[in-house]
Amino acid sequence: MKLQFTKMHGLGNDFIVINAINQPASLTFLDPATIRRLADRHFGIGFDQLLIVEQAREGGDFRYRIFNADGGEVEQCGNGARCFARFVRDYNLTDKNTIRVETARGIITPTIENNGEVSVNMGVPQFEPAEIPFQAAQRMPVYPLQIGDKTIEISAVSIGNPHAVQIIPDIDLAPVTTEGPKIEAHPLFPERVNAGFMQIIDRAHIRLRVFERGTGETLACGTGACAAVVCGILRGLLDTTVQVAMHGGNLQIRWDGKDKPVWMTGPAITVFEGTIDL
């Protein structure tokens, strides 16, 4: 089968987008082994995540599915959500600028701004351990986490997918490649976890690196940016609107506090279109 795809990125976090509304048969062929082959940057297309556009099932405008480079399906991807919104608008699947999108963890609402950037209502952050999921006796702003022979301090939150965020003094010296895999696979996170490393510059600016579950470190992570900011706000360290600087560029994150949704704003870029044999 020939598969049509569009390559996109949000701050260097790169994706291929598959229109399964026009290519419903593609879902039959996209098993984990095929996704891993397509994700290979030497022998395939190369991407951090594969995004699928499907018909809505629960009253939204579209259904949004995400697969990591290892072939596993995940609940949410913030940079991908912005690319998803630009894709359905640019390819005339909708004429709306605000779109209701179904995900595995509920509805998100991307809005295409006049300057071409996309703002996404990512929903209300979840801090209860059972909702993350994270094995802890009670909800706390900071948890100790044993990593090998050392104990680190993390904050834990779900932004539709699980995140563990730690504050470090210098992002350039962050142990992302050594600690990231250990945090990702920590037994207290039964569904694994995205590991965030945050440096606070001031109350309105942070720097961030994220080791993503099933992918590794990426140039940017939208849900990771949301997670870092809401954890910083919860601990009284950040203001309600924060600029998050990552290797791939900047996102603006806003959270007005308890029971309020977190908003993410940033770019979504189309790189090229292509066809590949499955």
From Swiss-Prot:
Kindly give the Gene3D superfamilies that the UniProt entry links to this protein. Answer: Diaminopimelate Epimerase, Chain A, domain 1
Q: Which reaction does it catalyse?
A: (2S,6S)-2,6-diaminopimelate = meso-2,6-diaminopimelate
The principal location of this protein is cytoplasm
Fetch the Pfam families from UniProt: DAP_epimerase
According to its UniProt entry, one GO biological process term is: lysine biosynthetic process via diaminopimelate
Acetylation as UniProt keyword: no
Q: Where is this site: Could be important to modulate the pK values of the two catalytic cysteine residues?
A: 163, 212
What keywords appear on the UniProt entry?
Answer: Amino-acid biosynthesis, Cytoplasm, Isomerase, Lysine biosynthesis
Q: In which pathway does it act?
A: Amino-acid biosynthesis; L-lysine biosynthesis via DAP pathway; DL-2,6-diaminopimelate from LL-2,6-diaminopimelate: step 1/1
Q: List the coiled-coil residues.
A: none
Query: What EC number(s) does this enzyme carry?
Result: 5.1.1.7
Q: What task does this protein carry out?
A: Catalyzes the stereoinversion of LL-2,6-diaminopimelate (L,L-DAP) to meso-diaminopimelate (meso-DAP), a precursor of L-lysine and an essential component of the bacterial peptidoglycan.
> What is the official name of this protein in its record?
Diaminopimelate epimerase
Species classification: Bacteria, Pseudomonadati, Pseudomonadota, Betaproteobacteria, Nitrosomonadales
